């Protein structure tokens, strides 16, 4: 089972990417995935959506096809978003506009919101409300909000708040188990063919 983790921060060396790499290893260590991969939006690797995607523009195909194949080969996702000005970063919202060919469809995704303080609730609400309609990604009812992120999940234990760090590590294992179970279950749903329709290609 492959789980792909999308680090939604535009920043280089971001806390979102730190958490993504920690979670990727946790999924492997706990037998919740057989393969993981982190795709980072640091540095804005994906241009803003335009009609060239629909028209088969060669430049878009060269950029997106390799990533499309990786997404299509994944059984589930972890979507990590920092909270910027109470919002999901523009690059992460743009990411969801690019996949209309079933790469994400009917696959489970765990939302992980990242906050440097006690916030983090707004990205969860925003992603659940407005990022799934046409790509049909399936968000779990479980989510994580990693608060005071600079003080947890650091490789250098001296930088961690021991109690908070332990809590988040345990909660990540719990959420990873749920994601893994959903990935197994929804694979059968997709393979049944019930989700495929040439008529109803877009959500309502």
Identify the meaning behind each predicted range:
Residues 94-102, 129-134:
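A glycine- and small-aliphatic-rich helix-loop capping segment at beta-alpha/alpha-beta transitions
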Residues 37-48, 101, 134-158:
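Mobile beta-alpha loop/short-helix "lid" or hinge segments that flank ligand
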Residues 1-97, 160-173, 186-204:
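N-terminal beta1-alpha1-beta2 submodule of the flavodoxin-like/Rossmannoid cofactor-binding fold
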Residues 90, 103-104:
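Acidic/histidine-enriched, beta-strand-rich ligand/metal-binding domains
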Residues 34-35, 106-108:
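Short acidic capping loops at alpha-helix termini that bridge into adjacent secondary structure
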Residues 108-152, 167-170:
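Short, glycine-/small-residue-rich phosphate/pyrophosphate-handling segment
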């Amino acid at each position: 089972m492959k789980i792909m983790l999308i680090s939604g921060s535009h920043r280089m060396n971001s806390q979102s990417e730190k958490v993504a790499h920690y979670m990727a290893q946790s999924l492997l260590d706990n037998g919740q995935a057989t393969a993981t991969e982190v795709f980072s939006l640091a540095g804005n690797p994906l241009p803003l959506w335009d009609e060239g995607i629909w028209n088969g523009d060669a430049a878009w195909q060269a950029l997106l096809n390799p990533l499309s194949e990786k997404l299509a080969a994944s059984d589930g996702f972890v979507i990590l978003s920092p909270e910027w000005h109470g919002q999901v970063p523009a690059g992460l919202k743009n990411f969801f506009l690019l996949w209309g060919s079933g790469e994400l469809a009917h696959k489970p995704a765990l939302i992980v919101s990242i906050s440097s303080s006690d916030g983090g609730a707004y990205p969860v609400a925003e992603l659940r409300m407005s990022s799934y309609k046409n790509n049909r990604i399936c968000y779990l009812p479980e989510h994580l909000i990693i608060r005071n992120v600079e003080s947890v999940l650091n490789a250098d234990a001296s930088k961690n708040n021991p109690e908070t760090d332990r809590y988040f590590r345990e909660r990540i294992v719990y959420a990873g188990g749920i994601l893994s179970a959903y990935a197994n279950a929804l694979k059968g749903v997709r393979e049944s063919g019930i989700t495929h329709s040439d008529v109803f290609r877009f959500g309502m």
